[in-house]
UniProtKB/Swiss-Prot annotation:
Protein name, per record: G2/M cell-cycle inhibitor DR6
UniProt superkingdom: Viruses
GO BP field: symbiont-mediated arrest of host cell cycle during G2/M transition
Domain notes: The N-terminus is involved in nuclear targeting.
Source organism: Human herpesvirus 6A (strain Uganda-1102) (HHV-6 variant A)
Pfam families: US22 (PF02393)
Encoding gene (name): DR6L
Keywords per UniProt: Host G2/M cell cycle arrest by virus, Host nucleus, Host-virus interaction, Modulation of host cell cycle by virus
An annotated GO cellular component: host cell nucleus
Function: Inhibits the host G2/M cell-cycle progression in a p53-independent manner.
Similarity-based family: Belongs to the Roseolovirus DR6 family.
Length: 389
């Protein structure tokens, strides 16, 4: 009986994997024209001009597409009077550089190397038909990287480093998509009582009631739920992180030095206002140490290398956004704008280092994006940078 059940389950998994491969192959076929950007992104201008108005279904999320347009910024300015006043200047119609997205006159977004970007069209939803859809532009870089530019929010998100990666991820790295798409599934996996408790905490957080959230976390400390994460394709999800309710005193006893680091980031009079440590996010990851060997063989069966548990505190602020604080490294960054967004993003919210902010539009709690242009030397980690205003 169990063997038959295993065979049936294995057959379902293999069918699901085959469907994922076919979906990825179809997505790659739809976006093969993005390969024209290698070396000269301006080649995409002619393709987008010839196929203007054509809708191309995005790999993820469902009901989202790309409307090809050779000059999307001009149409955005004509359709919305105030649209061009948000975000980057109107001269962005020509291929620009990542250097133009500097946070000030001396500091670039990620490094001092520029990257030519070519706009190819609007990113929009089939469900909503709004003029604000013309304020979300897809851009392609010289090295094949794909970006989405939110003109209204003045933010540039690096979706993928190559066309192949974009056909697999889609808009998974864009945090704004999780907030705007109401049909995205909840990534929580827990019991009914735990789910109801987290919903009550989320409702209290939306009302900016830190006292209620703190009381619930103290009464129900230790209650947890798993957060699912997609692996390989956007439709296969596995438990990858755990969200556990806690109280600050317990975490301060475990990490005495982390309390001082957290108060240095969230100082008195911070724009985000009062704050509260309400939970802990934990997930396993492979270590970066070269020894012991990363992969060993036991009985001719390869086993994964050493793994460690990554722990981040969930900090709720009075202004609304959730912050993640790593007590071992002292790093802090914006996790999500609300609990509902965190439930949709899952563990992916812990790796939010792909968004660049325009000058003067850097939000408190935004992490510096990871640089994709300058690779660190082997055995060396990137230099730490400031994380909060």
């Amino acid at each position: 009986m169990s063997t038959r059940h295993t065979q049936r389950t294995g057959g379902r998994i293999s069918v699901r994997r085959n469907e994922a491969r076919l979906a990825h192959a179809r997505a790659r076929a739809r976006f093969d024209w993005l390969l024209l950007a290698r070396g000269r992104p301006s080649k995409l201008y002619g393709y987008a001009s010839r196929h203007r108005g054509e809708l191309i279904h995005l790999p993820w999320p469902p009901c989202w597409c790309l409307e090809l347009h050779h000059d999307p910024y001009r149409d955005a300015r004509s359709a919305t009077v105030w649209g061009h006043r948000w975000g980057w200047p109107a001269t962005h119609v020509r291929p620009r550089c990542v250097q133009d997205c500097a946070l000030d006159s001396c500091l670039y977004v990620c490094c001092g190397y520029g990257e030519k970007l070519q706009p190819v069209g609007f990113v929009k939803s089939y469900v909503t038909n709004s003029q604000l859809d013309t304020l979300r532009v897809l851009l392609v870089g010289k090295d094949g990287a794909v970006y989405v530019h939110h003109m209204r929010a003045a933010r540039l998100c690096r979706l993928a480093s190559s066309t192949t990666e974009f056909t697999r991820r889609g808009l998974q790295r864009d945090a704004v998509t999780y907030e705007e798409d109401l049909e995205l599934p909840d990534q929580r996996m827990c019991g009914t009582n735990a789910r109801h408790l987290f919903d009550v905490i989320a409702a209290a957080a939306d009302e900016h009631n830190l006292l209620t959230v703190g009381g619930l976390c103290q009464t129900h400390a230790g209650v947890s739920c798993n957060l699912l994460e997609t692996v390989g394709d956007p439709w296969t999800a596995v438990p990858a992180a755990r969200m556990t309710l806690t109280v600050p005193q317990v975490q301060y006893r475990l990490w005495p030095e982390a309390r001082r680091d957290l108060r240095r980031h969230l100082y008195a009079g911070h724009p985000l206002g009062p704050w509260l440590v309400c939970g802990v996010l934990s997930r396993e990851r492979e270590t970066q140490k070269p020894s012991p060997p990363i992969r060993t063989t036991v009985g001719n069966v390869p086993t994964p290398g050493p793994r460690e548990v990554e722990i981040a505190w969930v900090v709720l602020t009075l202004a609304g956004p959730l912050l993640a604080f790593w007590p071992d490294t002292g790093k802090i960054c914006r996790l999500a704008n609300s609990f509902s967004t965190l439930w949709k993003m899952g563990p992916r919210a812990m790796r939010g280092h792909w968004t660049y902010s325009a000058p003067g539009r850097h939000l408190p709690g935004d992490a510096w994006p990871l640089c994709e242009h300058v690779r660190p030397q082997v055995g060396k980690l990137p230099r730490k940078r400031a994380y909060l205003d």
